[in-house]
Amino acid sequence: MLWVDKYRPKTLDKVTVHDQVAQNLKKLVAEQDCPHLLFYGPSGSGKKTLVMALIKQMFGAGADKVKMENKTWKIDTGSRNIEIELAMLSSAHHVEMNPSDAGFQDRYVVQEVIKEMAKNRPIDAKGKRAFKVLVLNEVDKLSREAQHSLRRTMEKYSASCRLILCCNSSSKVTEAVRSRCLNVRVNAPSEDQIVQVLEFIGKKENLQLPFGFAARIAAQSNRNLRRAILFFETCKVQQYPFTSNQVAPPLDWEQYVSEIAADIMKEQSPKRLFAVRQKFYELLVNCIPPESILKKLLAELLKKLDSDLKHEICHWAAHYEHKMRLGSKAIFHLEAFVAKFMSIYKEFLVSTFG
């Protein structure tokens, strides 16, 4: 078992990084009137850990008995019948899934899942909670139609179903959905908190950590706790005892994006743009999210840029990221950003050096 799963807090009492949020969630459960919830915060901040600990607090050990299945939904859209297959985790008390995986058909999935859960409402025999919990991940990636559908169904079936929504950015969730949930902000842990977690894991695994080793991993993780723990375990597998100057190796795709940035800085031409496009295709084929590619590419380019250009380049990166979210072909927008960058940078070089 990976350390990131082995040392994940299983109950709200054991949560240390977001202890105040955990205590507030405990109060909600104690009052037995838990509303719909929207957890939002950066990747690796601990949203999923809090959600699973909350479900266990609500339903006890039964929530741990989880099975994974690929379920096929047969849906009548009115004009035709469609079949959608999605992976889902479920226990007797909750279902967890990612409806955005269904693409443009996500709204049908949202409607059908909530309807089915409402039909299979648990019997309130011994004062137990007579509702099931539906955990929806990456709600910010749902289409507008799916979010409107979500708002209607969460109102209709609120007596038998509670929704826990997770996303990285609440600004991409419609106001209608946000206003019907209790919003829970989960901040990225500080580097000091990450160091404490790494030292705790090191102690449990009987590892000797050189001075400053945990701090270097924390700095390298960009305040992503999940990534920091994975880096820590990677270092252990690669070399133990640890050395005083040991660092975690960069992720392969991040190294590849760094090489793309270097290529762009060396030459600005249609030939180089075509070569960069081929490299983008390789990243996308290997399921690297286009938003992550653009963000990493921007960070690498900014390291090499004159300060006079940074504001303009950030503006265009934001512009093409927005376009990318509205469109369906990410490669067009990644290539357009690189073309725009090449144009701006070439003009800057000509005006500066002639």
UniProtKB/Swiss-Prot annotation:
Tissue specificity statement from the Swiss-Prot or TrEMBL entry: Expressed in roots, leaves, shoot apical meristem (SAM), flag leaves and panicles.
A cellular component term, taken from the record's GO annotations: nucleus
Positions with a binding annotation for ATP: Y40, G41, P42, S43, G44, S45, G46, K47
MF terms in GO: ATP binding; ATP hydrolysis activity; DNA binding
Protein family per UniProt: Belongs to the activator 1 small subunits family.
Record PANTHER family: REPLICATION FACTOR C / DNA POLYMERASE III GAMMA-TAU SUBUNIT (PTHR11669), REPLICATION FACTOR C SUBUNIT 3 (PTHR11669:SF1)
Name of the protein described by the UniProt record: Replication factor C subunit 5
Native species: Oryza sativa subsp. japonica
Gene (name only): RFC5
